């Protein structure tokens, strides 16, 4: 599997691999990651995890610091890249 360099590149990862890797993260972290992502990546996350109520979770979280979003993005990239090493 080709390594990804940033969170936006998750859209290029095989869906089965991506879903397995992302399943390790709590819903709140997936929603926070989506807060700093493109509309395309947000659609991908919502499609992969239809059981997450993104709107309700966003209201519950309210505001999040960009540093936290960046930390979650980096952790997701690391997890995806290490998934099949």
Sequence positions of predicted segments:
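General marker for long, soluble alpha-helical cores
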Residues: 1-85
């Amino acid at each position: 599997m080709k390594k990804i360099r940033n969170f936006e590149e998750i859209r290029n990862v095989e869906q089965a691999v991506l879903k397995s890797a992302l399943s390790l993260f709590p819903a709140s972290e997936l929603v926070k990651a989506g807060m700093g992502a493109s509309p395309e990546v947000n659609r991908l996350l919502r499609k992969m995890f239809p059981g997450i109520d993104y709107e309700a979770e966003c209201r519950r979280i309210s505001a999040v610091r960009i540093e936290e979003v960046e930390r979650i993005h980096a952790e997701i990239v690391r997890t995806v890249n290490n998934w099949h090493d």
